A protein has these predicted regions:
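Conformational coupling and interaction surfaces
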Residues: 1-4, 8, 14-15, 20-136
Length: 136
């Protein structure tokens, strides 16, 4: 998502050789979603922060769901999770791709390596997140 908004910047970051971890949105980070009932079950009544987060998330979701079932992806938590513990996500090394202006990658096996996250352990990460928020 972020990359398609500034491909030129992405090409610089992916090409400069800096240590880089890529967390793809579609099919990877997008799996880290929660629902109203899940938030109610695990956060409601734990403390003021938890109640605020439940209320805010449900309020925002209702703006687009309008009474239908919904889930919310908690994008930013996955980046922090990679830094915290290698057990929340699975990754491997790949040659740094070249982001194309057509929303595709050009692959070059001569380029430096980056770390590519291919799986978020959703339940483990939410269990940890809910426990930490509940202690706040």
């Amino acid at each position: 998502f972020n990359m398609e908004h500034d491909v030129a910047a992405a090409r610089i970051i992916f090409g400069c050789g800096v240590a880089l971890v890529q967390l793809p949105c579609a099919g990877v980070v997008s799996e880290f979603a929660t629902s109203g009932p899940e938030l109610e079950c695990h956060l409601r009544g734990k403390n003021k922060l938890c109640d605020y987060l439940v209320d805010l998330t449900k309020s925002e979701a209702e703006k687009y769901a309008k009474g239908k079932a919904w889930t919310r992806i908690i994008w930013d938590v996955t980046a922090v999770a990679w830094l915290l513990d290698g057990d929340f996500e699975e990754d491997y090394l790949v040659h740094s791709p070249i982001p194309g202006y057509d929303n595709h990658y050009v692959l070059d096996p001569q380029r430096h390596f980056i770390r590519y996250v291919y799986h978020v352990k959703r339940d483990s990460l939410f269990t940890d997140l809910f426990a930490k928020l509940g202690r706040s």
